């Protein structure tokens, strides 16, 4: 399966996408 794409903006330090971490201001792996 394809891994979810990280890249949403994160404000509270958490990301909605599984496996992604907040590297302000965006989520990434």
From Swiss-Prot:
GO terms classed as biological process: defense response
Placement of covalent cross-link Cyclopeptide (Gly-Arg): 1-29
Changes after translation: This is a cyclic peptide.
Cystine pairings recorded for this chain: 6-20, 10-22, 15-27
Coiled-coil segments: none
InterPro entries from the UniProt entry: Cyclotide, Cyclotide_moebius_CS, Cyclotide_sf
Function noted in UniProt: Probably participates in a plant defense mechanism.
Family according to the record: Belongs to the cyclotide family. Moebius subfamily.
Designated name of the protein: Cyclotide psyleio B
The organism's taxonomic lineage, starting at the top: Eukaryota, Viridiplantae, Streptophyta, Embryophyta, Tracheophyta
């Amino acid at each position: 399966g394809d891994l979810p794409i990280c890249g949403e903006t994160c404000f509270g330090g958490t990301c909605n996408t599984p496996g992604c971490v907040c590297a302000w201001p965006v989520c990434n792996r």
